Amino acid sequence: NTLRWGVSGQAELISDHISEWEWRDSAGYSLPNDGQTMELYYAMRGDSSMKSARVQAYIQNEHKWNTASGQWIFTIGGRLQWWSWNNEVLPSPRASVEWLPGWKRDFCFRLATGLYYQAPFYKELRDTVTDALGITRIVLNRDLKAQRSVRVVLGGDYYFRAWGRPFKLTAEAYYKYIDRMESYTVDNVRVRYSGKNDSQGYGAGLDLKLYGELVPGADSWISFSTMVARQRPINGGAWIPSPTESRYNFSMLFQDYLPQLPQLKFHLKMLFAEGQPYYAPRNSQAWGRMPMYKRIDLGATYIFNAQTAKFMRAASAKHVKQWAIQFEVFNLVGWKNVN
């Protein structure tokens, strides 16, 4: 048996000021237009502060069991969280089993499940109310609960050799259901949360990844993922894509070096993915999808250590194992992407 445990705590002190407004102007009038006054289309104000404390603890026990069918590894444990802001206690039990079959030690299969909580941080607490003047004001929601999800992951690894080189193929299928979910929208680099447990959602997908050393000492890999992630209001309504949904993703990393100069490594990275959803301002039910994201990067890394650089063997550098200089060209082809 292997038993692990830990406890941590932190204190938080946050002060926040927000002032936003939107004015829609046209030739001779602004929107909204009543013919007499100039009105803002949207305005938000907020001055808030928060003091809170968090305590977290975890315990995990791992047991290995050898049988005629192979080696079994059972892991069971859990996390416990408490936050002074809403006085919520969050127990999170988890378990997994891993099997290394006796008939083929190059395989490994695993199954994991658990109840997970994502405790909110300050930005997620910001609820809104609209006053008589039409100004939206920030209020902190003390009744906001942690988002809760049930997850199941089934996966496996296969170790093999091809062309005289080691490879590893990893596959994982997953599903999660989320309730007490807090909806949010993404506007460029701004993430705006609703401040309420107003949604539910689910996600499911498949991840495939092949690792290999095409040249000794330099890892390369290729991966493909497909997934679906949907959410809807908790009181019903249409399922819409979650802001991070990308239904397919293909990526690759290839590394190589000169045999006469192994400390100089070159790498090529490729990424092709479906564009993520976008939404109309302050209306998440009206949405579209960005074009496909595609990029190729090329780079080089030079590693300095005691074997490759004389100055690294000096007494002044005895506490430094190695350091590196990296040069990289992003988006080598110059494709135009929407972000």
What is each residue range found by the language model?
Residues 102, 143-202, 325-330:
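Membrane-embedded beta-barrel scaffold of Gram-negative outer-membrane proteins
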Residues 49-55, 89-91, 148-152, 175, ...:
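Residues that define the transmembrane beta-barrel architecture of outer-membrane proteins
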Residues 1, 9, 57-63, 95-99, ...:
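Residues on the lipid-exposed face of transmembrane beta-strands in outer-membrane beta-barrel proteins
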Residues 1-86, 170-173, 221:
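Face-selective signature of the C-terminal outer-membrane beta-barrel domain
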Residues 1-2, 65-72, 101-107, 161-167, ...:
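Short loop/turn motifs that connect adjacent beta-strands in outer-membrane beta-barrel proteins
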